[in-house]
């Protein structure tokens, strides 16, 4: 492995122009679950997975994943943001679809190993890019009956990425959809599983085709309250209060959890509650938040079916609260701002 690393020293990447897409890297790490226990961590240079055509992940959706990032800081240190929360969330997602949870210590060991092995792909400080980390657990047993697999594979690969939205940190339009539901109130919406994203593809494609950044879902039961915002959580700002939906069909965002804490640190009130659609008209600022984009400020939200528009941004630009929250979170991730809550894990000094 050392010889391979020496031979692969030179990279010719325009870090500042990276898109949010897949780029091959040197190594991924894997761990198999067989006979009721997790095995040893293995390092692989292959991008392929040997898999039976009857594997449960292909037929019955036994698949859960995560997304987190490694950042090279101003001080040269490499930090991963809140990976303990990602370990908890993928464990919960796995258990939600009857898969064994990867132990938190093994999850952390694998993250550290895969980031270290692919150090040359960590974008430099100041480039605006980061190393995206994708953990994945899949059912591997060959079955044609609907039941949990007996064997599983947990793996992590990494790839350098640029901003999720080409516009970067800018206010963009969103649209409300009533034709589709992302997840049922007591379904898999709170788990990070592939089926939720498959269910959003048609609405997402229609929104993009119409010129919107993403689609907005209303609650599936009554179609009255704001729910998930594309593949991100929604929050609104008014009267010095950070307000985000309380729902049994929304993925609990680690970014949103962090922003709520930062809002409290800034002296704001935080509310998690139902947000009626008509309340959108009262927000001073609003955004969609998640690992990929951190915060995507909202310019306006269109409701095409009712021929109505909720204008959020007064000048088409991100508001002061969204901007401060974004800069603070990014500053913590990059080591520019004190990490008061001990969110960062130092991977390399």
Please provide the spans of the model-predicted regions:
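Short, charge-rich binding segments
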Residues: 120-126, 146-148
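Extended, Lys/Arg-enriched charged tracts that mediate electrostatic binding to polyanionic substrates
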Residues: 123-134, 138
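Intrinsically disordered, low-complexity linker/loop segments enriched in Gly/Pro
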Residues: 117, 139-140
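Helix-start/capping segments and mature chain N-termini
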Residues: 1-114, 143-349
């Amino acid at each position: 492995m050392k010889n391979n690393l020496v031979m692969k020293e030179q990279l010719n990447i325009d870090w500042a122009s990276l898109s949010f897409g897949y780029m091959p890297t040197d190594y991924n790490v894997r761990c198999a679950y067989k006979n009721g226990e997790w095995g040893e961590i293995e390092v692989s240079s292959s991008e392929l997975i040997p898999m039976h055509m009857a594997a449960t992940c292909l037929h019955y959706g036994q698949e859960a994943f995560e997304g987190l990032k490694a950042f090279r800081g101003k001080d040269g240190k490499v930090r991963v943001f809140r990976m303990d929360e990602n370990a908890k969330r993928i464990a919960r997602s796995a258990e939600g679809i009857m898969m064994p949870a990867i132990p938190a210590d093994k999850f952390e060991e694998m993250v550290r190993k895969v980031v270290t092995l692919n150090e040359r792909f960590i974008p430099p400080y100041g480039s605006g890019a980061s190393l995206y980390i994708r953990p994945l657990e899949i059912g591997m047993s060959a079955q044609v009956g609907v039941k949990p697999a007996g064997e599983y594979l947990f793996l992590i690969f990494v790839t350098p990425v640029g901003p999720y939205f080409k516009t970067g940190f800018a206010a963009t339009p969103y649209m409300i959809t009533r034709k589709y539901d992302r997840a049922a109130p007591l379904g898999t919406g709170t788990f990070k599983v592939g089926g939720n994203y498959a269910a959003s593809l048609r609405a997402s494609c229609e929104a993009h085709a119409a010129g919107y950044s993403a689609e907005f879902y209303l609650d599936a039961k009554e179609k009255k309250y704001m729910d998930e915002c594309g593949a991100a959580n929604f929050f609104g700002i008014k009267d010095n209060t950070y307000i985000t939906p309380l729902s049994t069909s929304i993925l609990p965002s680690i970014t949103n959890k962090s922003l709520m804490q930062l809002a409290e640190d800034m002296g704001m009130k935080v509310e998690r509650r139902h947000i009626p659609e008509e309340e959108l008209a009262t927000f001073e600022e609003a955004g969609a938040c998640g690992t990929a984009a951190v915060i995507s400020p909202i310019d306006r939200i269109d409701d095409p079916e009712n021929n109505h528009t909720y204008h959020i941004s007064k000048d088409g630009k991100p508001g002061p609260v969204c901007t401060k929250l974004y800069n603070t979170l990014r500053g913590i991730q990059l080591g520019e701002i004190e990490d008061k809550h001990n969110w960062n894990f130092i991977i390399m000094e």
